[in-house]
Amino acid sequence: MPELVGLRKPYIQVRRTDSDCITYGGDQGFFGGAPVGSEDERKKNMGCGIIALADLFLYLANKSEEYRTEKNRNYVNRILTQEEYKKYYNVIYQFLGGIKAGAKGGLSCIRLQRSFNRMAHRNHWELRAKWGLRSKGLYDRIEEMLGKDIPVI
């Protein structure tokens, strides 16, 4: 029987304002209903990479004090309200430099990788993000990350 591999800690949880349901991870839909052309509309339409990175930082911080920073310290190890998550998202959004008006897409994977590595270097984490386009070894890399209790994005 194959070995099951997955995260060992509970994933990020956010209580939705409109339904009181709990999501696993953030949702760029939290910015729904924003005026056309607004920054919040850009977050809704192109913020999936930022959500992924924000969730990764928060998961690591939930996992170990070593990964807590001034950016995530107030949001660890609890169910966040939707408004709290949006505040946290905005902190990460500013760290990443935001999404410029008129952008045709969200943040590139390379930019997310560099931002993660910058944060890891500043905080002396022994982690490094890598971006790879080849599918060779993909499942082995995913299994390795999950084996180290690191979400795959």
Language-model features and meaning:
Residues Q82-I153:
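Conserved active-site-adjacent core of cysteine acyl-enzyme catalytic domains
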Residues M1-C109:
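Active-site-adjacent structural segments surrounding the nucleophilic cysteine of cysteine proteases
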